[in-house]
Curated annotation (Swiss-Prot):
Subunit structure: Interacts with Moe (via FERM domain).
Taxon lineage: Eukaryota, Metazoa, Ecdysozoa, Arthropoda, Hexapoda
Gene3D superfamilies: Rho GTPase activation protein (1.10.555.10)
Protein name as annotated: Rho GTPase-activating protein conundrum
Region Required for interaction with Moe, residue ranges: 185-294
Domain Rho-GAP, residue spans: 359-565
Xref: InterPro entries: Rho_GTPase_activation_prot, RhoGAP_dom
Manganese listed as a keyword: no
Organism in which the protein naturally occurs: Drosophila melanogaster
Gene: conu
Site residues, Arginine finger: 402
Basic and acidic residues composition-biased segments: 240-258
The protein's role, per its UniProt record: GTPase-activating protein (GAP) for Rho1; functions with the ERM protein Moe to regulate Rho1 and control proliferation in the developing epithelium. Recruited by Moe to the cell cortex where it negatively regulates Rho1 activity. Can also promote cell proliferation independently of its GAP activity, perhaps by acting with Arf6 to positively regulate Rac1.
């Protein structure tokens, strides 16, 4: 019982810590408006990101992509990546076909509807489309006739008789032969208001016709439509029907009451002895499947020659590599049947009014370069110094990141940094020395919380979250690919934070902060609720599941650490092969086989020469940014 009580207490404490950070995130900024993609737009965006915008042009014109245009591109790709391209193109073509079928058809012409009737007629008709052209009588003969049509005469004489005919429901009405008249001006009388518009240009119907029978009529304003009455109205049939239905339902419920009660008792008896079979925040967070896979991969001796650090790849090669990374990510998601839910960027930019807090990472780095006059490490200067101070004084502090600082002192420090950081950056060290480590950790979480865009970017954060549906190995590969796709400043900032978290975790015996504690505290900052939120905000189960998955993903990101930023060399070689394929890869390869090349030079890069690729990036360090913790 004591172990169960401790587990309950730990579960409640962890979830309450997450909720505290979650509410701080929710109260700071409202939920971002989501701009949804139209059908096919997301697939077109993926093709553009993968470097194949030419495949989206037929879709923009409402046409399907032909095999003739697709085959030359597929020959330059590996089989999994080619299948990913084919799947995206197939979706675009399907969208085009659906749009073509859903287009509104032309309204049918009235002359087409009565074409057979017109062909069978023997009387020459007028070419006009007026009702007079449909009359079977000649115009002169109709107007020279002194007597009114049969219907008019009968109606004037037998108005009361016709009203009685309406009340007699079982009476059989006489049928007469079909007879149509031109639009004669009706006589003034009591019948003028029977048919609305009869004084304009409307044919007067007869009592009977071939296939048409006049059953009755009502004066305008005499027809009463039923009104919706309240259930308490004694004249309301709706209420009586509802009561009868409720009585029937009550009888059926009485018959099933014993079965329901017995089933509920069995269910409660099954769940009460095992309270942890229900949805639990702690059980999802501590799901050991992915965490065990991380530990297995960490213990395996994977040769470092198979990977290249992302900071060693030049900017030009990184742009070329991103096309393959998008295809590799699409392959992983398609293989596991997970939707490529790439978030559509919000066009209207948020106004950045702050000086240090509430400012994008890119803007902070530009300001740092203006102040220091040197190349930046693509990590904000404020964050570098803040992490350095926390590591120097607080790495062994118990409850670091969990315990909050003094609220009033933290607010004073926040205002001082916001107003004087870039005006007097040398004073930063003095401000940090006067603050406690818990106040500094509160500033770190607040800085992440007030970023105008999430650290994982608005475009990729939904893909990061969807990785929780992938199996363990694919999940870690997808997370690594997404880290490579981040902008350089976001990627380096994330790397700096993960390194800081791992240093804290390595001292968990002293500071009492293990990986689960750190992930629970930092998950709302990594996955802000204004971007990642359940579809049903009123469902407690959905909220708990979402919170637990965010903590679990943050846990995996921390455990993987530096391994997230290692690029497989086979992807680097494939990116070169793809680029060469667009420019004549086969011709270039044949010329390299004929021409003798000196050995040991980094410029001679071919397919399958992984060591040569590593030498190339190892010798070119001009683009290398210093990485500071």
């Amino acid at each position: 019982m004591n172990s169960n009580t401790d587990l309950h207490h730990s579960d409640d404490q962890d979830f309450s810590e997450f909720l505290n950070e979650y509410y701080l995130q929710s109260n700071s900024q409202s939920i971002e408006p989501e701009a949804s993609y139209e059908d096919g737009e997301m697939e077109a965006e993926w093709l553009v990101s993968a470097g194949y915008p030419e495949l989206t042009k037929p879709f923009e014109q409402g046409l399907e992509v032909s095999k003739k245009d697709l085959e030359p591109i597929l020959t330059t790709l590996s089989k999994p990546h080619a299948e990913a391209i084919v799947q995206l193109v197939r979706t675009l073509n399907k969208t085009v076909r659906v749009r073509t079928k859903s287009r509104p058809k032309r309204k049918p012409d009235i002359r087409d509807v009565f074409r057979e009737f017109d062909e069978q007629g023997t009387v020459t008709r007028s070419r006009s489309a007026t009702p007079d052209s449909l009359d079977s009588l000649q115009i002169d003969e109709a107007w020279t006739n002194n007597s009114l049509p049969t219907f008019v005469n009968v109606y004037e004489k037998n108005t009361e008789t016709a009203i009685q005919c309406v009340e007699q429901s079982n009476e059989i009405y006489l049928k007469q032969n079909l007879r149509r008249t031109p639009s004669a001006p009706p006589k003034s009388g009591t019948y003028a208001d029977i048919f609305r518009g009869s004084q304009v240009r409307c044919d007067i119907p007869l009592y009977s016709a071939d296939g048409v029978e006049l059953l009755g009529y009502s004066r305008i304003g005499t027809i009463q439509f039923p009104r919706n009455r309240s259930v308490s109205d004694p004249f309301c049939s709706i209420g009586r029907s509802k009561e009868s239905r409720s009585e029937n339902d009550a009888r059926s419920q009485k018959k099933k009451s014993s079965e329901v009660l017995s089933a509920s008792e069995n269910e409660c008896g099954r769940l009460l002895p095992m309270p942890y079979n229900v949805l639990s925040f702690e059980s999802i967070c501590r799901d050991s499947s992915s965490l065990d896979s991380c530990e297995v991969l960490d213990t395996c001796d994977i040769p470092s020659t198979l990977f290249t650090d992302v900071v060693l790849i030049s900017e030009t090669d990184m742009k070329r590599l991103q096309t393959i990374l998008w295809l590799e990510l699409a392959t992983i998601f398609d293989r596991n049947k997970v939707s490529l839910d790439k978030r559509k960027p919000f066009k209207r930019r948020r106004k950045e009014e702050g000086n240090l807090f509430g400012v994008s990472i890119n803007a902070l780095i530009r300001r740092d370069q203006q102040v220091t006059g040197t190349d930046s490490s693509l990590v904000p200067l404020f964050l570098e110094k803040l992490i350095g101070e926390l590591l120097r004084r607080g790495s062994r502090e118990e409850g670091l990141l969990r315990i909050g600082g003094h609220k009033q002192k933290t607010e004073l420090l926040y205002n001082e940094l916001e107003s004087t950081f870039y005006q007097n950056p040398d004073n930063l060290d003095n401000l940090f020395r006067t603050a406690t480590v818990h106040e500094l950790s509160s500033l770190l979480k607040r800085w992440l919380r007030e970023l105008p865009q999430p650290l994982l970017t608005n475009e990729l954060i939904q893909l990061f979250y969807q990785c929780h549906t992938l199996p363990s190995i694919d999940q870690m590969n997808a997370l690594s690919i997404l880290c490579h796709l981040l902008p350089p400043e976001n990627r380096n900032t994330l790397r700096s934070l993960l390194s800081f978290f791992n240093i804290i975790i390595n001292l968990k015996d002293i500071n009492k902060m293990n990986v689960h504690n750190v992930a629970t505290i930092m998950a709302p900052s990594m996955f802000p609720p204004r971007y990642i939120h359940p579809s049903d905000n009123n469902s407690i189960a959905e909220q708990v599941r979402m919170a637990a998955q965010c903590c679990r993903l943050t846990n995996i990101l921390i455990l993987r650490g530096e391994k997230l930023f290692q690029v497989p060399n086979n992807l680097i070689v494939e990116s070169q092969k793809t680029m060469m394929g667009k420019k004549g890869w086969h011709r270039h390869r044949n010329s390299n086989e004929i021409t003798a090349k000196p050995s040991g030079k980094a410029s001679n890069v071919g397919v399958g020469h992984d060591s040569t690729v590593i030498n190339k990036y190892s010798t070119n360090l001009k683009h290398l940014h210093p990485f500071v913790i």
